[in-house]
Amino acid sequence: LILANDPDADRLGVMVRNAENNWQWLSGNQIGVLILDFVLSALKLQHRLPQKGVIISTVVTSPLVSKMARGNGLNAVEVLTGFKWIRQAALRIEKEQGGKFVFGMEESHGFLMGNHSGDKDGIWASMAFAEMAAALKQNKLTPIDRLNQIYQQYGVHLDALETQTFKGTKGIAKIQQIMRDLRNSPPVSVAGQAVVKITDYLENTIICGNETRQGPG
């Protein structure tokens, strides 16, 4: 097991041995899903899973996170990219709605449980992942084994990151044009798969077929 933090220790990277005994890099989504699974299992075992518990993730994070939250009777909330939005949502939900923030994550390797920190915490995440791996080892399982079990329960979720850079004022104009085009002519299919729902976080709308309703707010 290899655990690594970035210089300010707010993110966590992980490599584990796979079935072929080769090192396998885990994505931020995979790390977060494993930590979330461990947190939920521990809270349930201790009978401490809050009735109004909330799991918060960003819009670019795997939908598996929300599925796991709802599968354990918790609310799932998605916010814009950036951990500050996770923290703001957690504070608002606890203050205004009487909810309890349980766990937050973003696919860019940022994770947090509870209110001990105002930002993502790579040190806590490292400790949580190490404890999770040790518990799995006692049951003769690896993090990869547990990840596959989660996939069997909630469905396989795969993701890959592609970066495109648009520099300067021309780049900004290009980005704005892309967004306008998407809104004016939303795709009906992507890679041969039908688009069933479009969420517009600027206009705060959700489009399902011919129906348009208010978005997540």
Regions found by a protein language model. Name each.
Residues 1, 21-24, 42-43, 47-217:
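Phosphate-binding and adjacent anionic-ligand microenvironments
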Residues 10-30:
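Short Gly/Thr/Asp-enriched flexible loops that form oxyanion-binding sites at enzyme active sites
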Residues 1-13:
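N-terminal small/polar loop signature for handling phosphorylated ligands or for N-terminal nucleophile
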